[in-house]
């Protein structure tokens, strides 16, 4: 009889332990790769995509870079015009973008009209300039404001971009500016590092942006107009943009993705064969191809320091507004310090002690680790 009681007690204890374990640690892997963990009875936490991300090395004959696992890498252009886009197939706004050089950003609309007139009269060599976008006030900001136009233009005019899709930065709006430390600063016009918002296919994104706009010089071209029997000319010259870099994410999630994207971008390394081929094909006066890695490393260092010194009140306000719009409140784990978004009312029904409401505004400047719910 005693042995039966002991066996029953053992079975009951084992069942209790299994039940306890199931309630406090059950993990489910979701279709998107994130994990949902049950931390307490009735409490579930689903990690963010940024928290769940794993990385892997991507390598070609031209370059190598560490990327978030599962992201898609596309390339276009040749030599100094080479571009790389690394994007999340589930959310293309989550993206890393590099373009070594953008060319033919016309000085004025008068110059564009002159090139168009020249082209219409049969000068097929004028086609590139006749279709080029205009950058009237040269600066990093204004370059990105016309970047969508540039992407459409160069894709149409340069077959080396065939099959490549440039990101779109429509409605580009600067929210914060930082001083540039690039080695092109003495040549560049209106150069800054920018934090900005934008839209792509109607969806709002946010990110950090850099580019060095350099003047190639004026070029007198006939406007086709006669004044006193003298043919008039206009400025048909253009600007170029070097070291065009952007890291972006869906607005209000960039705070979660920034460190992931920056750390990945820091690993970009162009091969010696690519640099040598670019050197041979280029005749650059202010941005020698051999400086590619140096220029890029400077940009990434500047991104990191700029993000650390950003105006965090902007994040606090934006994150609070996003929570109010989407119906969230924030709580934090008193044991780990991790921060979570919870649907409104979570703290009304949660009677435990581990998760407490966020009362420190500085917590809104930190990335959340996931979403918490009480069942």
Where are these regions (language model features)?
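Bacterial N-terminal signal peptides that target proteins for export
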Residues: 1-11
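C-terminal motif of bacterial Sec signal peptides marking the signal peptidase cleavage site
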Residues: 19-22
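Bacterial signal peptide processing site
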Residues: 24-26
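Conserved polar/disulfide-associated segments of primarily extracytoplasmic proteins
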Residues: 30-32, 74-244, 249, 297-301, ...
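N-terminal low-complexity, Pro/Thr/Ser-rich intrinsically disordered segments
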Residues: 30-57
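Proline-anchored loop/turn motifs at beta-strand termini and strand-loop-strand connectors
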Residues: 60-78, 265-272
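Surface-exposed amphipathic alpha-helical segments
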Residues: 71, 243-287, 371-372
